[in-house]
Amino acid sequence: MITAEDVLELTAASRVAPAARLPLPANPDAPVSVVIPAKNVAAYIGETLASALAQSQVGEVIVVDDGSTDNTVAIVLAIRDSRVRLMTNDSAGVSAARNLGARYASGEWLLFLDADDRLRSGAVAGLLTAARGAPRAVLIYGDYNTIDSEGRQIGRRGLLKGRRKPSGDVLTRLAAGNFIVNGGIALARAEAFRAVGGFDTSLRYCEDWHCWCRLAAIGEFEFAPQLLLDYRLHTSNTMNAAVRTPGDFLPAVARVFDDGLILARLPEGSASGLRRAAEIHLVTYSAMQAVRFGRYRDVLAYLAMIGRRSIKSLPRSVVRVALARFGI
């Protein structure tokens, strides 16, 4: 049994309280609670909810509205499914919304689904199958593909279906760079998520990476080699991604490598090298985003930045950027 006393906690302002149950009993046949933070997503929330409710192993879907001014709330209220719960969290941010939903979740497992994405058929079943084969795992994860605003597939990540990602003790690999890029591809054990304090609300970006690292510090991960999620690229989220720079991610790097729980579990003397690897990973990610949006001058600047940090890392970063250009 994992308790909050077993780990070093976040500050009180960021900490997730123990579960506060809604009047919905836990269902052993449907052990997953889906938490959806939502703000002005009327165009997509119906499709997102339908994809979650189509998963028979989902016992509840908790939508946390974060101050929507469009018809998001009305669309959620119109759905006649007893598994849907609506909460409000006035413009406190996505991390606070997720934490609030997690606090009130009754499921053994949590899945954090963005309100404009959609789960693929059988996604939750695939994750639970992997979980049964990994009883010590605190997080089970798979992979995703990308779709456009109309739901048409634009990514080609299916070409990588033979690729394996880390399982077991993944902390060292994860500290070097986030390979779980969307919460919709992962099940987090609710007890463990609450024990590590949930998402740090002080971080604007990469708060998920920090949380996954804390989870990896207390338990194992298991990879399920399936495409589980359609990650939607549309005007709002691509405009946001297009203006991010590597500097936007540095607070998360500092937080990860100043976290006592994480540092205590890293191999002695490894933190400096892993921090440098994480910085290179995030600059590479910035270059991948830039190439997707046709900002080729920024691509060259970011690759030059990587070369100055580590010439050995440059070829791999160039390959990743080239693959991103073709939706991989």
Region spans (language model):
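C-terminal subregions of glycosyltransferases and related glycan-biosynthesis enzymes
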Residues: 1-26, 233-328
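Nucleotide-sugar donor-binding/catalytic module of glycosyltransferases
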Residues: 2-247
